[in-house]
């Protein structure tokens, strides 16, 4: 480990204004301190417009400045920390649509689609070294952009029963647009290592009173292990699918609430790698017991359906 520390402070102020019933505007200003260094003032502007009350169709957009100090792990982790890292900074633009509809006591349906575009200087990324461990470094210029889509459907087919479905998909190219570090550098114009371009997930949850059964499926597209994006045996990691299931039970007592959870991870014993030469576990089992004390009196009994 390492014996390092620093004081971190942050402050945020925002102003919100609705000139009309349908239009909303917001400006936020943030500033942070890490150790003895302050970030510049970090502004953000947000707007939303209610296109239609039917279905609660809303258009949203924002522009924000990005500024990120390296974490203590980035700087000092052993082995691999890099105390010479620069700070990330840049701008992000996004826009999207969202909707929400439903019928009380029967179902709710929500969804959103967002386009984003980020231009980041000195992007911090951890990459493998010739010594066998990872170390962070700065990528001079990165253009990260893409589309994110999310949807949620909750159905109550009968009393005490609830079916909850969540789905998401992301297309997120992250391209190195910096300068060549040497004449042989082939990383410019290529996807960043270990960043999948496509990912998706689907979660289904069936709840009955204090019981819940959950199935989660996830997909990650191929990832390159080298900045040159070479299609060699060790130059990329293949796509993989993952399935997990779990059964939960909530118990309620006067002094505490107890959550019991039994999970089967990697249900179909998928062979996959998140990092080159480091195989991930096959099918494995997990038992979780969570205890939440109750402080005060007259606590309402409720079923916590969050994982």
Place the predicted regions along the sequence by residue:
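Transmembrane beta-strands of outer-membrane beta-barrel proteins
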Residues: 25-27, 43, 57-61, 93, ...
């Amino acid at each position: 480990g390492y014996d390092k520390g620093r004081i971190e402070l942050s402050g945020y102020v925002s102003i919100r204004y609705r000139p009309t019933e349908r239009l909303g505007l917001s400006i936020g200003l943030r500033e942070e301190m890490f150790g003895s260094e302050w970030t510049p003032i970090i502004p953000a502007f947000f707007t939303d417009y209610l296109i239609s009350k039917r279905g609660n169709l809303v258009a949203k957009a924002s522009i924000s400045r990005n500024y990120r100090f390296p974490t203590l792990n980035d700087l000092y982790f052993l082995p691999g920390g890099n105390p010479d890292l620069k700070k990330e900074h840049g701008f992000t633009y996004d826009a999207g649509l969202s909707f929400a509809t439903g019928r009380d006591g029967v179902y709710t349906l929500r969804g959103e689609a967002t386009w984003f575009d980020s231009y980041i200087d000195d992007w911090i990324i951890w990459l493998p070294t010739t010594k066998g461990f990872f170390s962070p470094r700065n990528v001079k210029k990165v253009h990260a952009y893409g589309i994110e889509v999310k949807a949620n459907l909750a159905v109550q087919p009968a009393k005490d029963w609830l079916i909850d479905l969540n789905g998401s998909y992301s297309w997120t190219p992250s391209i190195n647009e910096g300068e060549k570090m040497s004449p042989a550098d082939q990383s410019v114009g290529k996807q960043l290592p270990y960043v999948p371009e496509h990912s998706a997930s689907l979660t289904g949850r069936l709840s009955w009173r204090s019981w819940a059964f959950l199935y989660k499926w996830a997909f990650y597209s191929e990832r390159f292990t080298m900045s040159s994006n070479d299609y060699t045996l060790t130059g990329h990691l293949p796509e993989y699918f993952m399935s997990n299931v779990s059964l939960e039970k909530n118990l309620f007592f006067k002094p505490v609430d107890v959550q019991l959870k039994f999970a089967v991870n990697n249900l179909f014993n998928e062979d996959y790698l998140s990092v080159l030469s480091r195989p991930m576990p096959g099918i494995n089992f997990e038992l979780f017991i969570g205890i939440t004390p109750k402080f005060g009196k007259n606590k309402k009994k409720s079923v916590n359906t969050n994982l």
